[in-house]
Swiss-Prot record:
One of its GO terms (biological process) is amino acid biosynthetic process. One of its GO terms (cellular component) is cytoplasm. This is 3-phosphoshikimate 1-carboxyvinyltransferase. It comes from Saccharolobus islandicus (strain M.16.27). Its EC number is 2.5.1.19. One of its GO terms (molecular function) is 3-phosphoshikimate 1-carboxyvinyltransferase activity. It comes from the Archaea. It catalyses: 3-phosphoshikimate + phosphoenolpyruvate = 5-O-(1-carboxyvinyl)-3-phosphoshikimate + phosphate. The gene is aroA. Pathway: Metabolic intermediate biosynthesis; chorismate biosynthesis.
């Protein structure tokens, strides 16, 4: 797919894309209780989660209703994922808790992602692994209810262990510092407690005392990280937008911080009663911000930093190298295509903002990374541009291009 973008000014109201982080967690909750998700958007990552719970015995009706099995067991000996890192990293400890043997594989982008920490941890508790990367055969059953794991590689392992210890009727997790993306662990803890469980997270320890979980019926709330590209598009193009279907920002949840970050850079950016109001200003300020707790915000911040006055610095970027693409290099490449300079340091990237009228009109290949396409499309609204392999947005937000059209973006899709 090729998308051609012409100079446009964004305006209008748009519904935030559903949170894939929340959708995947809700789908995995169907291992324990009935879940009915209204109007579920079937992004590639969500489909990976659906196929995973189906392989563990969950009955799935119309890709929206999920009925737990009487007994959890591995129904399929081979689970093929597409590209969902969240699904993969949560699935590994879950199948280890159920016990048996299963092989997991995925597309090349996921094969490149490290699994070292979860393999190291579970090897100490009765699980055998064929390797520390995909394709991966997992054999055995967790032999302990008290797990130690390093927290530096991915928070998704810890979220998966919370599910695993619910399968084992309780236990504890000790996370060896540093703890990356702690807010996503807190999201999982909060979700289980909302459904009636008893999960406590103090310092670096999580204690799980399961209760019967209540059923859920409703729609998945919007995703601040994905919605931020609509906000970025409005700010870069000189427009305004209102983004709806967002839950109230939590103090702990990193992605919500984008509302405040854009405001600190000089934009009108306010949340009120489920709506995020965004309006462009004539100029934006540079910023220094640490994104270790919310790495998915890097490209939105980089996009606005490209046209901000002065030099911005995004720190805490180490884990950007193990996303769908090497996002540190992807940010540098996209910025360079638009004529914006940048410099990578040991754990930060400097972005040297320019007047937006000086932005180039390049051709950008999305590098099989949905956020590359979204960042580039926002910058292209100033002087135009072309996105190739533009179908990559289907990983998280299949409706992205149509949404831009509804916001008065001038684009053609080939």
């Amino acid at each position: 797919m090729i998308v051609r973008i012409y100079p446009s000014e964004i305006s209008g109201t748009i519904k935030a894309p559903q949170s894939k982080s929340l959708a995947i967690r809700l789908i995995f909750l169907s291992l324990f209780t009935r879940i009915h998700l209204h109007n579920l958007v079937l992004s590639e990552d969500v489909i990976d989660a659906i196929n995973s719970v189906r392989a563990l015995g969950v009955e799935v009706k119309n890709n929206s209703e999920f009925i737990p099995p009487e007994k959890l067991e591995i129904k399929k000996k081979f689970i093929k994922l597409k590209g969902s890192g969240t699904t993969l990293r949560m699935l590994i400890p879950i199948v280890a808790a159920i016990g048996g043997e299963v092989t997991i594989d995925a597309e090349e982008s996921l094969r490149r992602r490290p699994l070292k920490r979860i393999v190291e941890a579970l090897t100490n508790y009765g699980i055998s692994f064929s390797s520390s990367s995909l394709p991966l055969t997992i054999t055995g059953k967790l032999s302990s209810y008290n797990i130690k794991i390093s927290g530096d590689e991915s928070s998704q392992y810890i979220s998966g262990l919370i599910y695993a210890l619910h399968i084992l009727n309780g236990g504890s997790i000790e996370i060896l510092p540093p703890i990356s993306s702690k807010s996503y662990i807190l999201l999982t803890v909060d979700l289980f407690n909302r459904f009636g469980s008893n999960v406590k997270f103090y310092g670096n320890k999580i204690h799980i005392n399961p209760n019967n979980l209540v059923e859920f019926q409703g729609e998945v709330a919007g995703d601040y990280g994905l919605a931020s590209f609509y906000a970025l598009s409005a700010l870069v193009s000189g427009g305004r937008t209102t983004i709806v279907n967002l839950w109230e920002p939590k103090e702990y949840f990193g992605d919500h911080s984008i509302v405040k970050i854009l405001k600190e850079m000089g934009a009108t950016s306010e949340y009120l009663d489920g709506k995020w109001y965004v309006e462009a200003k004539d100029k934006y300020s540079s910023i220094k911000v640490n994104i270790d707790d919310a790495p998915d915000l890097a490209m939105t911040i980089a996009g606005l930093a490209a046209i901000a006055e002065g030099t911005s610095e995004i720190t805490g970027i180490e884990r950007l190298r193990i996303k769908e693409s090497d996002r540190i290099e992807s940010i540098r490449k996209v910025l360079g295509l638009y004529g914006v300079g940048s410099e990578v340091k040991s754990n930060s990237i400097l972005i040297f903002g320019i007047n937006k009228r000086m932005l180039s009109s390049p051709i950008t290949d999305c590098l099989n990374d949905h956020r590359v396409a979204m960042m580039s499309s926002a910058l292209a609204l100033v002087n135009g541009g072309v996105i190739t392999s533009a179908e990559c947005v289907s990983k998280s937000n299949p409706n992205y291009w149509q949404d831009l059209l509804s916001l008065n973006a001038k684009i053609s899709i080939e």
